[in-house]
Regions:
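Cofactor-binding loop segments of dinucleotide-utilizing enzymes, especially the Rossmann-like FAD-
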Residues: 2-3, 32, 106
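N-terminal beta1-alpha1 ligand-phosphate binding loop
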Residues: 1-25
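A generic structural motif
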Residues: 22-29, 130
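Glycine-rich phosphate/pyrophosphate-binding loop and the adjoining helix
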Residues: 130-176
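Helix-loop-strand module that forms the ligand-binding subsite of alpha/beta enzymes
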Residues: 47-127
Length: 176
């Protein structure tokens, strides 16, 4: 998740996607809020921060990655960009390589994080993350899609299920 907020809309969206997974699939939320900013000077076995090592090992063990992020100034939050950078290094040892990806953006605004969605996709192309193209997952006006108990409303869940089913089909075809 690209958001650090305690009551993040994107956290609610990510949790809703996780609950929709069919039997036999497991979701893991990989911690990124503790990652020191990437600095190539620290890229030695003796100096690499333990958080980088933990993060890389966790992502390396995943079969695919679902990125759920807000949009900040038509781009992704710095914490998410930093996680992409940490995972992509050292060069030639990227943890992202060939992992099927899904990009979901949620925003209180009407265009649903369109700028962040496409900016993230640009980075994922370079990182060699094959990403589901259709259906696109822009969740606009997200504040109106959450009920008084903090849950995503039913009609939106069916849209999420359509996206998730397409991603799982895409991912399975890539890994067969």
């Amino acid at each position: 998740m690209g958001s650090l907020r305690k009551d993040s809309y994107n956290k609610k969206v990510a949790e809703a996607f996780a609950k929709l997974l069919p039997e036999g699939y497991e979701s893991v939320f990989v911690k990124i809020d503790d990652l020191p900013f990437y600095n190539e000077d620290l890229e030695t076995p003796e100096q690499a921060p333990a958080e980088w090592t933990r993060f890389r090992e966790e992502v390396r063990g995943l079969d695919g990655v679902v990125f759920v992020t807000p949009e900040y100034n038509r781009s992704v939050p710095a914490v998410l960009k930093n996680a992409l950078d940490v995972g992509s290094r050292p060069y030639g040892h990227s943890v992202w390589d060939h992992k099927p990806g899904l990009v979901v953006t949620a925003s209180p605004g009407g265009i649903g994080g369109f700028g962040a969605n496409h900016h993230l996709r640009q980075s994922l192309v370079f990182l060699n993350v094959p990403t589901l193209q259709q259906p696109e997952a822009y969740i606009g006006n997200v504040a109106n899609l959450i009920d008084e108990n903090g849950n995503i409303v039913e009609g939106t869940l069916s849209f999420f299920q359509t996206i998730l089913d397409a991603y799982l089909d895409f991912s399975n075809k890539l890994t067969e």
